[in-house]
Amino acid sequence: MSSAQCPALVCVMSRLRFWGPWPLLMWQLLWLLVKEAQPLEWVKDPLQLTSNPLGPPESWSSHSSHFPRESPHAPTLPADPWDFDHLGPSASSEMPAPPQESTENLVPFLDTWDSAGEQPLEPEQFLASQQDLKDKLSPQERLPVSPKKLKKDPAQRWSLAEIIGITRQLSTPQSQKQTLQNEYSSTDTPYPGSLPPELRVKSDEPPGPSEQVGPSQFHLEPETQNPETLEDIQSSSLQQEAPAQLPQLLEEEPSSMQQEAPALPPESSMESLTLPNHEVSVQPPGEDQAYYHLPNITVKPADVEVTITSEPTNETESSQAQQETPIQFPEEVEPSATQQEAPIEPPVPPMEHELSISEQQQPVQPSESPREVESSPTQQETPGQPPEHHEVTVSPPGHHQTHHLASPSVSVKPPDVQLTIAAEPSAEVGTSLVHQEATTRLSGSGNDVEPPAIQHGGPPLLPESSEEAGPLAVQQETSFQSPEPINNENPSPTQQEAAAEHPQTAEEGESSLTHQEAPAQTPEFPNVVVAQPPEHSHLTQATVQPLDLGFTITPESKTEVELSPTMKETPTQPPKKVVPQLRVYQGVTNPTPGQDQAQHPVSPSVTVQLLDLGLTITPEPTTEVGHSTPPKRTIVSPKHPEVTLPHPDQVQTQHSHLTRATVQPLDLGFTITPKSMTEVEPSTALMTTAPPPGHPEVTLPPSDKGQAQHSHLTQATVQPLDLELTITTKPTTEVKPSPTTEETSTQPPDLGLAIIPEPTTETGHSTALEKTTAPRPDRVQTLHRSLTEVTGPPTELEPAQDSLVQSESYTQNKALTAPEEHKASTSTNICELCTCGDEMLSCIDLNPEQRLRQVPVPEPNTHNGTFTILNFQGNYISYIDGNVWKAYSWTEKLILRENNLTELHKDSFEGLLSLQYLDLSCNKIQSIERHTFEPLPFLKFINLSCNVITELSFGTFQAWHGMQFLHKLILNHNPLTTVEDPYLFKLPALKYLDMGTTLVPLTTLKNILMMTVELEKLILPSHMACCLCQFKNSIEAVCKTVKLHCNSACLTNTTHCPEEASVGNPEGAFMKVLQARKNYTSTELIVEPEEPSDSSGINLSGFGSEQLDTNDESDFISTLSYILPYFSAVNLDVKSLLLPFIKLPTTGNSLAKIQTVGQNRQRVKRVLMGPRSIQKRHFKEVGRQSIRREQGAQASVENAAEEKRLTSPAPREVEQPHTQQGPEKLAGNAVYTKPSFTQEHKAAVSVLKPFSKGTPSTSSPAKALPQVRDRSKDLTHAISILESAKARVTNTKTSKPIVHARKKYRFHKTRSHVTHRTTKVKKSPKVRKKSYLSRLMLANRLPFSAAKSLINSPSQGAFSSLGDLSPQENPFLEVSALSEHFIEKNNTKHTTARNAFEENDFMENTNMPEGTISENTNYNHPPEADSAGTAFNLGPTVKQTETKWEYNNVGTDLSPEPKSFNYPLLSSPGDQFEIQLTQQLQSLIPNNNVRRLIAHVIRTLKMDCSGAHVQVTCAKLISRTGHLMKLLSGQQEVKASKIEWDTDQWKIENYINESTEAQSEQKEKSLELKKEVPGYGYTDKLILALIVTGILTILIILFCLIVICCHRRSLQEDEEGFSRGIFRFLPWRGCSSRRESQDGLSSFGQPLWFKDLYKPLSATRINNHAWKLHKKSSNEDKILNRDPGDSEAPTEEEESEALP
């Protein structure tokens, strides 16, 4: 109840007590309640209870004609506050509204009751109380009640009355009017809030009597007269006055009555007992039908009978409205009297007293609730029956439906109330269904609609009313006459009677009468047949004679003006149904669906709330409707009352398109909405009826009638407390389903459980009730709002055997089963339990019983957007299941603080690829498994404080990616004593480490100082920090990069430091560590002691708007360069995939920067032409490198896009169900302009800004062509550059299909089309010895150039179609797991760069072995239309002409990355696609982990990034992935610079894996990779160089020896023959010829002496030389020995000898 309603209750109480007759009424009500407690009726009216406080009676009178729907809440039941409690605040509030009316209306109403012959309360008492009320009431209040004003009101309402057929009702005697008034009073507390505005307006329009007159006349007058003539006046005067007033009241009051009635039922139900003839009338909103879609339900649980009559005539529209109305109906149910009133009524005396008051006051509300008004006429007819035979007459909403087509109302008085519902199936069947549903709910009690309310309301009444209810209900048969009687046309006699009996308490009156008279009368008159005048031929009547709450509803066929025969038949059924008496006082009244549904065709609903009652719904087929003809299937619970609902087939027949069943056990309303099939025959199935075990049965009119009008939707709501529910539905041969009837929201707002698929079959319903747990009455309303949520198990709900029977049509139409609803409730309602919004799911501050025990898994459609922040703080989560994060793949921030986690496993966070913030503080974590954080490559922050971690074992922070982004780690407040994980100290980006309040030793500090070189802030335990502070000066002197911040506590602390000896020793290990740190890092480290109030939490308020990993264009483009080659390698359409994300930030760039692109195209050309120019540019223009790179990228991307469109068919766009134009359209037109993201991608803005502007969509090449032509001049250079770059890239990839960009383009300059081995041999040492900067530059620049060529090349050129395969060259591609053998064979075979496809020859030209991915053999992706080829089909031997990788959008779910190639059977095409990517990338990326990451990112980008809401997130993921690859590559470059190895090494070895396992695995991979891709380490290359050098040396030596040998062969000319030694074996001719050739060659430019150098000497010459030498020597001797006198001249002889 709203707060506004509570004041209304107070007002009501004050007024009730203010009235004199109330004490008498209270006494009588108490007496009646003791005998039989009848549940409040639900009045299913367009009007809902309003929270508005009751105005003074004067205001009522003054505004009688314009009573707002809320006004009905005038103080009605002042009797006892506890009565109000039973009713519920809303009920009480609503009940007060009628008091103004009650003064005058009660008197006639009481008289009517007396005249009707019902149990008259002691006339003196009633008269006294009513007279007192009259005296207290102002004349204005009396005026509205006066029949004259009522007549005036009918005059005003006459137009409506004519439409509905009110004319006849108006013609009916005043007794009918009084009856209506009584009914209005009983239904006086409708739910005004639920009334549609139109209804409210109408209610306002009538003069004072509109609400007051109608309801007040009926109720106030009878009550005023109650002491003496309560019964008489009701029967006579009300019947007399009613005819005149009915037309007015029926139109205006139905709503008000419905509104007021709910409030009144609780108390008034008991008071109504004083008015035995009071019936609860629910008039379908005939006049208020103009207010479509607003059904009101009024329930007076305590000892209240409900009369519901609905006319189907011309209510087909109304039925549709009603179908819609049920949606509103739930609203009414929650606030409405059902919940509110039911609780208030339990006290017997107050309820009786209040009921009468409510009846009096309810007239004010009848105007608001047309349904109630309708019921009132029916009630008028009902008075004709003896009070003992009190019937609840539900007038079909014929006339009122005309006005309130969409607002059916149902009144139910569960306890000891027999309910007769007569409804005309004509077009109103839908409405009647609504009434039936409403009635069913009403039976539960005020809160019946909301299951809890029923429990509250019902149970209190049950004890008293149960006893009384049984007999009273049986004796009193509430007959629901078609609303025509309300109109005073057809049912006028019946209505007059009903009114006479139930004039004041259409709802209460019946209940009160039931309570009063039922004890004696119930057994005798179990069946009450209300004959409907021929005018009501269309109305179906349902008589319910519960023992305690036997409820029989028999719908009459439209043609049947003779509803009475139908009702006669109905009585026959009611006795069966009456068999068990409800343990609970509650009675269920279901208006015939025909009547109410006719009026409210859109929203038929049957609500049955039973405490211990069986509810049997027997639809009586009218000749016209035919739905009544099929027998009802009744399921009788053995112990509990049996509820029979209209056969699902009937309901289905009319609601063929939708069937819903809502079951709310205990106080839960059971809503059954069967999908009616056109077949009317289902009724046969309905025929089956099981007698209730011992509980009264409630028979509802066949849902068929209601369905006929609500063809698309019928709703039955049953709220039992220990009851069995039997639902029998007869399909109407006539199916008049308004197409909107399905929309009738079968979902009662208060229903805890909704069984949509098979409501008709009681099996499903009762079963569902058993399965479902009934929510507490106080929580029912909340639960009702979510139909899928099941709040509690039914108390003791036993399904009848017949419930197993379901109509075929219903089974066919069933969409969900009860178990499915249960399942949905656990996952679908996360956003109801938690807070969803702004990309955040917050499940905090929950009640202890609601707190989460495990991570909730939402349904895919639960939330339209994505959750980037998950906050599960303060729950009871103790374990994290695997794959639980699959639905949260985009989460960046996860808070699991203050839960019960005890351990973390390596799969605890599997699937959170994008996670950056992880808060696990204040749990009970004791151990962390190795590789726990490996699934989180982008993690930046971890909070593990406030746990019970005692050690960090080896591998805790081990991950293949090395935790490259982790910069903050909090470990404080843990009993941490040992840190054995070296990976903690080696975290490359760690800048903040908090180890405060731990027990770590000094050794840990040493390791941190020595190994964690990037650490900037370290928080130590206070004792250790203070110990260091004692040597602050020494430490800072030794290592200037370490700064100690000592607080005052440390400076004054003189405690002995256990580490003093080690720290204070200048030559100790600690000082050496400091010196070593100073040598290899310049990062300043601040060491601080822990703060006394240290809080481990970190304020990340701006976390959601976090920047991308790269802040400028150069970084962004450079990061993309590391992943673009992989996209082309797997034949993905890079342009269509990446451009949307690259273009996202373009909106933030300045136009001036974009204009510089054209000027720098020449620079791009130079960049692309070769590595030499790149090196120069790198060294000369490092500062401008980023800008040029971006410009080059832009030019190349544009060229690629344009050239590709011109030369080849447009590549097929990534399929996006949400958009026809593809991702680029999204990116161009619906780009997020998030400032943070714009800044992050600021670099890419200029790159593709013109392109994004010029070609917003790649799916429209025709539009792009003109722009291509316009740019032809600008693209000239870029195209030529790309062509040359493509050739180099192709050659590179041909010889080395390696993943890393650096490797690919390492040898552009020297690459030749030869085998890999030959290429390696010819490498120049200079190339191998390039500086680290040069290699890094090549990796960053040239790869991206090549990638750009991949994007821009035409389909038939290198990297055609961005890697798409050509059908001509590779017609077949059998995809399977790539084995090393295949890769080796393929690479050796296809070494020549034949064309661009050679780079992918390892996949294109090979038949891969089968069986590797046998799990996927059955998967064949549906081919997609594409001009280039067929879609990629996966299988053991799948053939494809072109690998487009175009998959349907599977969703955003991301499966965990596969651990190996032995994948389990996959559940989605996305998983299979990822496997294929992994296999394709195997040769490019030998490292399994890197390969899986790249495959996963590509799969995400391809299949999960189509939605506009994930564009930014996808762009972030791409940027982070590229940044990660850049960091990993940089680390490998550092290693390469140290050991002079080639960049290919990174493929052979894992990046970070330094463990023994990684090393052993690395060796195996190295051997395999040597086979796959010829490549050698430094050692192998050195050996090879030495070998080559040796071979060359040997060759040179051999050559020299051969030449010498040839020269010496010439000595053979010597006569003596010169021995050739070892060379004599050489052929002579060969040697001579060679010598001649050599002589010929040497003849040019050689001196003569050199020619004869090796010429052999003849023997003569030798002898001559020897003689000369000998002679010379002898001559020298002579000269030395000659005497001085000797002649110096030689002798002639000597001279002659000397001559030759």
UniProtKB/Swiss-Prot annotation:
Residues 238-249, 358-368, 482-493, 729-749 have a biased composition (Low complexity). Residues 54-104, 130-156, 169-534, 559-580, 619-642, 685-708, 729-751, 758-777, 1182-1227, 1250-1271, 1676-1700 are annotated as: Disordered. This is Leucine-rich repeat-containing protein 37A. InterPro entries: Leu-rich_rpt (IPR001611), Leu-rich_rpt_typical-subtyp (IPR003591), LRR_dom_sf (IPR032675), LRRC37 (IPR015753), LRRC37_N (IPR032754), LRRC37AB_C (IPR029423). Glycans are attached at N296, N1079. Residues 1604-1700 are cytoplasmic. The keyword Membrane applies. The chain crosses the membrane at residues 1583-1603. Belongs to the LRRC37A family. Residues 36-1582 are extracellular. The keyword Transmembrane applies. Residues 54-65, 169-189, 223-237, 307-326, 433-446, 760-770 have a biased composition (Polar residues). GO terms for cellular component: membrane. The gene is LRRC37A. Residues 1-35 form the signal peptide. Residues 1689-1700 have a biased composition (Acidic residues). PANTHER family: LEUCINE-RICH REPEAT-CONTAINING PROTEIN 37A, LEUCINE-RICH REPEAT-CONTAINING PROTEIN 37A-RELATED. Keywords: Glycoprotein, Leucine-rich repeat, Membrane, Repeat, Signal, Transmembrane, Transmembrane helix. It comes from Homo sapiens (Human). LRR repeats lie at residues 866-887, 890-911, 914-935, 938-959, 965-986.
